[in-house]
C-alpha cells in the first residue's frame, strides 16, 4: 500500500544512457513540491552500479547512505527483465509498513536508451508520533 505523489520521465542522449533517472527525479520532485532531502528511502534500480553512483553524486548523497536500497538492489537480488519496477515498489511498500516514521520514498530506474523514470510515493502508515 502506497500513495503515488508524483512521477517524472525524462530522456538523455544515448551516450550517457545511465543518467536518465537524474532528470526524471528532478521532474518528479518539482511536481511534488519536494526536495531530495524530503525523501527518506530511495529504491534505485542498479542494472549497472555506475547508474546509482552517478545519481547519488548528482544529488550529493553518500554512497553508503542507509536510505539507499536498504534491502539490497539489483546487483544483490538480480535484475530479471521486466520485473525491476515491481520489485522496487514491493520493497518500498514493505519498508513503509515497517517504518511509519518515514513519509516519502522514491523509486527510480533507467529504462533503456537514455530514458529514466521516477515515482515519488507517500507512506499510508506515516505517523509523526513515531
Walk through the language-model features, giving the residues of each.
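Claisen-condensing/thiolase-fold acyl-transfer catalytic domains that form or cleave C-C bonds
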Residues: 1-130
Amino acid at each position: 500500500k502506497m500513495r503515488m505523489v508524483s512521477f517524472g520521465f525524462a530522456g538523455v542522449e544515448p551516450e550517457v544512457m545511465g543518467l536518465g533517472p537524474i532528470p526524471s527525479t528532478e521532474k518528479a520532485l518539482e511536481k511534488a513540491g519536494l526536495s531530495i532531502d524530503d525523501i527518506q528511502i530511495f529504491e534505485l534500480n542498479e542494472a549497472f552500479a555506475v547508474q546509482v553512483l552517478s545519481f547519488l553524486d548528482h544529488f550529493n548523497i553518500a554512497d553508503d547512505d542507509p536510505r539507499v536500497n536498504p534491502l539490497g538492489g539489483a546487483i544483490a537480488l538480480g535484475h530479471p527483465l521486466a520485473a525491476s519496477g515491481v520489485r522496487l515498489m514491493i520493497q518500498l511498500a514493505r519498508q513503509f509498513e515497517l517504518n511509519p516514521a518515514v513519509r516519502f520514498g522514491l523509486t527510480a530506474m533507467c529504462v533503456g536508451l537514455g530514458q529514466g523514470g521516477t515515482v515519488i510515493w507517500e507512506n499510508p502508515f506515516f505517523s509523526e508520533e513515531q
